[in-house]
Amino acid sequence: MGAPALLWPSLLLPWLTVLFGQPPGTLAQTQVCSVNQTIFRVEENTTVSEPLVNIFVPDGLHVTLGPLSTPYAFRIEGKDLFLNVTPDYEENSLLQADVECKRGDAVVVRLEVFVAVLDINDNAPKFSFEIKTFNVSEDTKVNTTVIPETQLKATDADINDILVYTLQEVTPNASKFFSLEGVNYPALKLDQTLDYFKNQNMTFMLLARDTWEENVEPSHTATATLVLNTLPADLRTPWFLPCSFTDGYVCIHAQYSAVVPTGHKLPSPLIMSPGPIYAVDGDQAINQSIIYSIIAGNTDGTFIINAHDGNLTMTKSIPSPMKFTLLIRADQEDMAQYSVTQAIVEARSVTGNPLQFSQSLYYGTVVLGSEAGTAVKDKTFPSEILRIQAQYPGFPDLNSAVTYRVTNSSEFMMNKDIMLTAVPMEEARTIRVEVEASNTVTKDTATAVVEIQVSERERTPTPPEAGGTTGPSSNTTMEAPLTSGTSQRPATTSSGGSVGPFPPGGTTLRPPTPASSIPGGSPTLGTSTSPQTTTPGGDSAQTPKPGTSHPTAPTSRTSTSLMTTSSRSDSTQTPKPGTSQPMVPIPGASTSSQPATPSGSSPQTPKPGTSQSTATGPISLPSTGAGEQGDGQRFSTVDMAVLGGVLGALLLLALICLVILVHKHYRHRLACCSGKASEPQPSGYDNLTFLPDHKAKWSPTPNRKPEPSPKLAQPPLRPPSPMSSSPTPPSSTPPSPQPKASGSPKTVQAGDSPSAVRSILTKERRPEGEGGYKAVWFGKDIGAEADVVVLNEPTADVDSASASGSEGSDDDDPDQKKTLRFGVDADNTYI
């Protein structure tokens, strides 16, 4: 054991000599370069101005940077190692300094210093696009990934950053259709079925953030725009138009019908109802072409349909009445979708439905001097072309085979249903032309007469001034025709015999006779008038309704029309109140007068607040409107408002004065009716005269004997009874005192008849010492409205016969008691 242990030192010595180049004794004595730290950590973007490390360099040695050092990253100043650059993790995450310790040119020792660059969040994420457009089909299934993550992913130079994605809608409600599959996985998926008609395109904003939360620092965000276009899908079948019902998604197809004559083959396509056979692609954005075909019901191949336009034509005639139910199919050109509907064609006999014109006599007009080829205008409606048409009632298909020609004149020719001049019209006259209509299928013919008036063009009235009184305005003028027939455009007349027909808007009728001056006044400068007349026994013109305006003052150099009425009523009706009736003509305008009718009935005077215009035959309806102040008005709206305020104040003062006068003259009656009548009747008394508070204050007079004739005496303390032989209504002044007759009440003798006046006496006598009965006399000739005066008068003596005769007369009539009580309480007041 001891011998091997002694051999180890002798064996290790040569190896140490080779490794260190010198014996172990000299290693302990030699010093080399050294550093106290070889690895450093520095955050990126940090500038280090202090030396990283101090190098220990023994005497006789020096240090330099070796070739293995990071270029330009370090420098050595003396014995200090400095960082020469600002580190950037994205450029170089590890910096190396190779320090060589040399003795002369020989390297004694090599030192390595490392700088690890720490990453910080200093870079924002980036998308590979700013705006990207994607197309999504309308029939894409829900939860399908429409855009993969690789096309939407953003990148960040900060390798350790985790990006968070957010999808924000720009188009309202777009977020209901699309969403991201995850906050860190930006794949786009479909959440709801698309509708091309509602959302043809949607826009989103895609955000990528390099922090989980938004409010931390530092935090960076990148944005990009996504545009999603919805592509239409072939989801709907062809639609036969017009749809009976449609909401844009579903169409209830139209069903067609037609009527054809038996025994005839129509050369042109059938006229279908409600319209021609026509189908469109239900997906309007795709709009595939449609191909038509008949799949059933075409007995004996009677009909054929055009595959491209759907026109249905006959291949042969139908011998007898029958009905065809054709099934029409419409296919898309790509044969992906189709629809079916039915067309019912009924064959009827044309017998009993001859070819005929709408009227036997037409009225046309041509302007004098018209060139050849000028269309004849309708005389009733001169702004419209006269159309002469012959038809088969109930067979519209036969009408297309009708041709027209002029049979008796070379001055006119027919272009379909329009008559044209063949030569210039150089003479004013009236021409009657015969037109023949013939059907090329049935060979039927019909004739009609056209009366054409060649006349000069009438001057068009100037339109009314803006804001002024609105008058009849027109673009063309015409005379009032008296036609026996009707034109193509029906002219309506009211049942009451009112004028008609009415021309359309834009025409005005002008009277054929010159206007006369205004009756009862001097004519205004530049004005003319037109009389408004009625025929014998004439019908009445219609009454203007309240609130309407019937102006009689058109603008300059125009004349109002005559209004002639037919015969059924007795007088023209009076315009109702509430409408304005301007009767002052504007200079250069015309007014109208209203003479009495020949039948003795006269037009009534228009009521205040109405205005009325006149016209002949077919009249144009004048337009009304709230006019502003025109050139011919004298006062502005402000002036009229001030005038209205002044008139209102005057009316208020007049009402106040009237109330004062009524109160002054009738207050005693008002006080009687309102104050006395409402007082409660006292209980326990038949007559208010015997109440203690209202007892008479006079002294009793001695009884006197009756005298044959009354004599004048001193006026009594209380007024005597005003009754006389002839009752008279009361006056506003109190009755004058009358001389009192001696004796019983002989003062009331009316008409010298005992039945003219009757006496009503009460049972009760006055207290002893006052004497007398209480009596009231009523005349039979006094009406209910006459006033009665109740007089309490003391008498000296009363005849026993009068007292006994009136004993019980007052008991049986309580109404009379009430009358007596009221009269006594009023004290000589008329009741």
Swiss-Prot record:
GO molecular function: calcium ion binding; cell adhesion molecule binding
Keyword Magnesium: no
Topological category with respect to the lipid bilayer: Single-pass type I membrane protein
Region (Disordered): 452-632, 675-774, 793-831
Side Extracellular, residues: 29-641
Primary location recorded for the protein, binned into one broad class: membrane
UniProt region (3 X 31 AA approximate tandem repeats), positions on chain: 541-614
Transmembrane annotation, as ranges: 642-662
Biased composition, class Polar residues, residue ranges: 473-491, 541-554, 573-582, 589-623
GO biological process: cell adhesion; cell differentiation; homophilic cell adhesion via plasma membrane adhesion molecules; intermicrovillar adhesion; regulation of microvillus length
Post-translational modification summary for this protein: N- and O-glycosylated.
GO cellular component: apical plasma membrane; brush border membrane; microvillus membrane; plasma membrane
Ranges of the Cytoplasmic topological domain: 663-831
SMART domains according to UniProt: CA (SM00112)
UniProt keywords, alphabetically: Calcium, Cell membrane, Cell projection, Differentiation, Glycoprotein, Membrane, Phosphoprotein, Repeat, Signal, Transmembrane, Transmembrane helix
Keyword Transferase: no
Sequence repeats: 541-571, 572-602, 605-614
Phosphothreonine PTM sites in chain numbering: T728, T795
Subcellular location: Apical cell membrane; Cell projection, Microvillus membrane
Cadherin domain location: 53-125, 128-240, 252-357, 358-459
Start-end of Basic and acidic residues biased regions: 761-771
Role according to the record: Intermicrovillar adhesion molecule that forms, via its extracellular domain, calcium-dependent heterophilic complexes with CDHR2 on adjacent microvilli. Thereby, controls the packing of microvilli at the apical membrane of epithelial cells. Through its cytoplasmic domain, interacts with microvillus cytoplasmic proteins to form the intermicrovillar adhesion complex/IMAC. This complex plays a central role in microvilli and epithelial brush border differentiation.
Subunit structure, interactors included: Part of the IMAC/intermicrovillar adhesion complex/intermicrovillar tip-link complex composed of ANKS4B, MYO7B, USH1C, CDHR2 and CDHR5. Interacts (via cytoplasmic domain) with USH1C and MYO7B; required for proper localization of CDHR5 to microvilli tips and its function in brush border differentiation.
Protein name as annotated: Cadherin-related family member 5
Species whose genome carries this gene: Mus musculus
